[in-house]
């Protein structure tokens, strides 16, 4: 059969090994519409796409035609058509390790809880998505012009490889119980961390 060893059905996240609520799928090959049929037949609600595992895609517009997903995690060197992800408005977990994924409107994801993304460009819709509880933002290169302080429901926050200089925004994040600051060499003071009572 054409799809032998080209995908795998999983019941846990392949990266953090957390148990999934529903069935997941890892695709090890180039996108083919037969994958969509399999997803519909099996009731797939979690999708993992990683080019280092064999995933290939030149255009992500196929996301518009998929069943509604709870989880979408993409690691790729291509991002053409990635705005089609906005049709997946039921996403709870979204991880985009891709180039040029900055134009996505996060406001469409009313149930979104967990996000991994890059922050080289400002995206107001990301910082207005108050449902987010877990945010990992890499390459946040917009200095202190972000609006992380608006994400008042954050429980877990990781900022990596950033040029931020101030942590004053932490004062607004009353529910934060996990904080990681990685390779952010321009931060001038860490005193604001003392305001976080739940760490």
List PLM regions with ranges.
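Concave beta-strand-loop units of leucine-rich repeat
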Residues: 2-37, 43-64, 68-165, 172-188, ...
